[in-house]
Amino acid sequence: MKLNELYNNIGAKKNKKRIARGIGSGKGKTGGRGIKGQKSRSGVAVKGFEGGQTPMIKRLPKRGFNCISTKKYNIINIYNIEEALADGRLSADDNITKEKLVEARVVNNKNNKKLVKLLSICSDDFAAPLSLKLDAYSSKAKDLIEKAGGKLL
C-alpha cells in the first residue's frame, strides 16, 4: 500500500447536503426554508422578539438613573508619582499639578475634562516632600504627604 492509495472506509465520511442547488437535489428551490414569510428571507432574526409573548426587556422594571452631578475621577496612586520622579518625568522642586501629570504621562486626561484623585494604595512610606495641587486626595494620601513634609495646595 502507498500513500496515494489510502482512502476512508465506506460510510466513514459523509458529504454534507448542498442546499438550494436544483430541484433534483432534494433540498432545492426553497432550500428547506418553506414558502414566503419572514423566516424565509435573509437576516431572519428579529432582536428581542419572543414569538408574541411579552419580551424580557418589557417584563423587567426600570431601575436607577444616571446622576449628572457625579464627579468622575482619574485615579492615581502615590507610587505612580514616585515612578515618574525616579524616571525624571516629574521634578520634586515644582508644584505638581494636573497639567504636569498629563505632560509626564502619569494621567491620560484628554482636554483635562476629568478630575484627578490621589490615593495611597500599596504605599506606606513616602519620603519626597512634594507640593501637590490636585482635585481630591484620600485621607491616607494626605497623611503620607504631610508626614513627608509636603504641601497640599
Swiss-Prot record:
Gene Ontology molecular function, alphabetical: rRNA binding; structural constituent of ribosome
Transmembrane spans: none
Record's GO cellular component terms: large ribosomal subunit
Record has rRNA-binding as a keyword: yes
Gene3D superfamilies per UniProt: 3.100.10.10
Residue segments, region Disordered: 21-42
GO BP annotations listed: translation
SS bond list: none
Entry superkingdom: Bacteria
Residue stretches of biased makeup (Gly residues): 23-35
Function (record text): Binds to the 23S rRNA.
Oligomer status and interactors: Part of the 50S ribosomal subunit.
The family this protein is said to belong to: Belongs to the universal ribosomal protein uL15 family.
HAMAP family: Ribosomal_uL15
Protein name: Large ribosomal subunit protein uL15
Classification of source organism: Bacteria, Pseudomonadati, Pseudomonadota, Alphaproteobacteria, Rickettsiales
